[in-house]
């Protein structure tokens, strides 16, 4: 039984629509959730064991109104789809409870806590799977259907290996019809259904121990949206591998290099997708860009892949963005450091959207989540560095909040001037303020400290104000801050 196709947003050119779920493999799930995910407004809503009962898995969702009552609080379309405007993201956290689970324990020993699976919601999983396999991807699981609730609910999945070792990609599609009696199940009469988010994950059971992950927090109306959907996934690869990874995602998943509207191809040709254009869709940062690092051989090459459309007349932040950072030859920076301690190439950090980054950081810090320290010297140079964005000077209240919470700010590499960009936030900094150049987008970012003892994975919060790309200045500031932390020279706890 085939479910109705989703209404495809005009900013998506691809069968692959958005990132459905991220799966962590961690050594201690409860500790990981309480230490890192709950401070970013994620709530545990479900749990399950695998068939062998050797692993336990928790399902988390952010912006949950009430974990004690999940009914009628979640917007679902086409019996299968979460409306992205809600700013939600599902995460699975998996941990082994068996000493004999050698595959799990060997990978944790090699990588530490890490991202093991990135799931993509697809209109047609067979199309996505066949395209990837025909272009060289390796199969993990053939397309299959799982039936739940007396065969009323159907979840289709297929799994492939990604080009990153020990990272898999799942293609998923749903046909969920068994809503509760309070909802009208007739799709023709109800284009949007409000229900329990667990309807979309029927293999999970609602968590029984309501006290297990209970935390004291502010009223949900004041914090929802502080941490939203995934903005981008940042990865690290070895020197000389950029073309291979770009080609793999282009051919196997149909992604393209993120660029501004003047550079978007006007037809379905693949020539543009395959071309790395310096300072358009491909960036190089060298030692000369750094002012405060002591290391001599430091830098990176960076490209951003996305499911941005091939032909568009306007900007809109794509729902999928993969940042690929390549190490330099003989380098000593954070990219090379990640590869060494992680045991190869992989996901370095996840960035989540925020509609109020100051509030999000305040809440996270109140729950003991630690962020990298940004030296005051960074803020002393802001007026000069961002003169093109703030012709007079940075508004006083904005600068004070940036310094108070340790947040970076930069104009993006690709400016988005589209007023209808629903993925970007309202520009709270410029309301009734003529001091901002409205034609230039900008971003505010902050990064957590490493979540492992190894200097490998961390998280990011990002607030976009009419911005599409990434700021080069913030990348440099992050490099220098992480160098201080990993070298042990950072004595101050933020």
From Swiss-Prot:
Its EC number is 1.13.-.-. Binds 1 Fe cation per subunit. It holds the Pfam family Glyoxalase. Its cofactor is Fe cation. InterPro entries: 4OHPhenylPyrv_dOase, 4OHPhenylPyrv_dOase_C, 4OHPhenylPyrv_dOase_N, Glyas_Bleomycin-R_OHBP_Dase, Glyas_Fos-R_dOase_dom, VOC. GO terms for molecular function: 4-hydroxyphenylpyruvate dioxygenase activity; metal ion binding. It is an enzyme of class 1 (oxidoreductase). Residues 18-174, 229-408 form the VOC domain. Fe cation binds at residues 232, 349, 460. Belongs to the 4HPPD family. May have dioxygenase activity. This is Uncharacterized 4-hydroxyphenylpyruvate dioxygenase-like protein. The lineage of its organism: Eukaryota, Amoebozoa, Evosea, Eumycetozoa, Dictyostelia.
